[in-house]
Amino acid sequence: MDGLPTTHKDFHQLDIWRNGYEALMKIYDVTATFPPDERYSITSQILRSANSTIANIAESHGRFSYNDKIRVLYIARGEICETRSHLAVALGRKYISKDRFITLNNIYCQLSKNLNLYINSLKR
């Protein structure tokens, strides 16, 4: 993430966004090894859901009301679940090893937990 702006009140400064960004970079790395014929199928789907996770976190940061922020963060939480589902399919198709699946799944489980903590902090 070198070179990204880090001005005050910028979504790039949110730990939850940074963690999601790091997870997304791992997804890009792993999907680069998927078969070419999956480019418009599971590769595209997992990249879209992983990208949407951090995009929704960023979008929520720009929302004015807490209820609206939380609503968008719930969408991000759904995208995390979708990403984990795609990882399970990739494992089933043997596009990733069990170890790689466990690592990535754990990263996204932790991201989901952290997102829940962030959502709860906004509710107070």
Question: Over which residues does each language-model region extend?
Answer:
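Amphipathic alpha-helical assembly/interaction segments
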Residues: M1-R124
